[in-house]
Amino acid sequence: MAAKKVVKATPKRSELYTVDAQGKATTSHRACPRCGAGVFMGEHKDRFSCGKCGYTEFKQ
């Protein structure tokens, strides 16, 4: 019998935005400069990285 595949849980798109008191939505994550708006970078301890294209920015 084949082993079952593990399904990775991705964050909901609504969790990546914050809404202020006036009702304006802003992003809580950094957008990838290569991929453009809508593709967010993951925040790690020492870097920001894009999961789509692999672009990485190191924290100072």
UniProtKB/Swiss-Prot annotation:
Organism: Methanocorpusculum labreanum (strain ATCC 43576 / DSM 4855 / Z)
Residues where Zn(2+) binds: C32, C35, C50, C53
Family, as annotated: Belongs to the eukaryotic ribosomal protein eS31 family.
GO cellular component assignments: ribonucleoprotein complex; ribosome
Zinc fingers, C4-type class: 32-53
GO BP field: translation
Name this protein carries in UniProt: Small ribosomal subunit protein eS31
Disulphide bridges: none
Pfam families: Ribosomal_S27
Gene that this sequence comes from: rps27ae
Subunit: Part of the 30S ribosomal subunit.
Keywords: Metal-binding, Ribonucleoprotein, Ribosomal protein, Zinc, Zinc-finger
